């Protein structure tokens, strides 16, 4: 349970993500003692929690992960932005988010839905939130496995999971 999956640090705030897998719902509790220590030692530190989802069956597409569905079909679904999670309630993992100054780049995929991205947009009013997706990934989860900043003007992007051309403009302009 890497911290980067569960908690997001933006400025002086630590945000607990919703987590979208039922088996990972309680992971945030492991970090609470450390977060409490930071909170007690720094009067400017903010500790926030996104709304914890219920993670009912309505949050997931039935049989989406069936072994009967081949990779080609999954690639088509990824290109169409049709994922295992529905839009029932906000869902996101912190590991689907990269921060570039005032820009938050959020991967829409298996663990982060559009309602989760909207929640982040509303929560971080002083930041620009950008949704991205990587059509070449049949199981899109956690942005740093696909896309990693190295320095201004340079990113590493997995060649099998390319950022669509229309989404590259943000990075080319900056």
Predicted regions and their residues:
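The feature marks the mature, well-folded catalytic cores of soluble enzymes
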Residues: 1-174
């Amino acid at each position: 349970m890497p911290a980067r999956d569960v908690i997001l640090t933006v400025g002086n705030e630590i945000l607990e993500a919703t987590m979208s897998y039922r088996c990972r719902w309680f992971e945030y509790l492991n970090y609470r003692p450390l977060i409490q220590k930071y909170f007690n030692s720094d009067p400017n530190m903010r500790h926030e929690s996104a709304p914890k989802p219920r993670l009912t069956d309505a949050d997931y597409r039935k049989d989406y992960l069936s072994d009967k569905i081949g990779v080609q079909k999954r690639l088509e679904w990824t290109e169409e932005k049709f994922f295992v999670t529905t839009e029932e309630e906000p869902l996101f993992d912190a590991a689907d988010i990269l921060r570039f100054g005032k820009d938050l780049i959020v991967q829409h995929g298996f663990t982060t839905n559009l309602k989760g991205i909207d929640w982040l947009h509303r929560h971080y009013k002083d930041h620009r939130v950008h949704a991205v997706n990587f059509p070449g990934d049949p199981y899109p989860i956690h942005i740093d496995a696909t896309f990693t900043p190295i320095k201004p003007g340079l990113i590493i992007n997995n060649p099998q999971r390319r950022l669509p051309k229309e989404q590259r403009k943000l990075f080319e302009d900056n």
